Amino acid sequence: MKRTFQPSKLVRARRHGYRARMATKNGQKVVARRRAKGRKRLTA
């Protein structure tokens, strides 16, 4: 059986990147929460 995690920088960025987050209302909330918490990295 193959491993379920097959890393790809492109897919990671498209799914969890900054522009993907900002594209939806809830994604914007995610970024806002992480900013408020003081996260060094906001998105993947």
Swiss-Prot record:
Biased composition (Basic residues): 31-44
Region feature (Disordered): 24-44
Protein's UniProt keywords contain DNA repair: no
Keyword set, alphabetical order: Ribonucleoprotein, Ribosomal protein
Recorded GO CC terms: ribonucleoprotein complex; ribosome
Spans through the membrane: none
GO molecular function terms attached to this record: structural constituent of ribosome
Single Gene Ontology BP annotation: translation
Pfam families in UniProt: Ribosomal_L34
UniProt record similarity statement: Belongs to the bacterial ribosomal protein bL34 family.
PANTHER family tied to this protein: LARGE RIBOSOMAL SUBUNIT PROTEIN BL34M, MITOCHONDRIAL RIBOSOMAL PROTEIN 34 FAMILY MEMBER
Protein known as: Large ribosomal subunit protein bL34
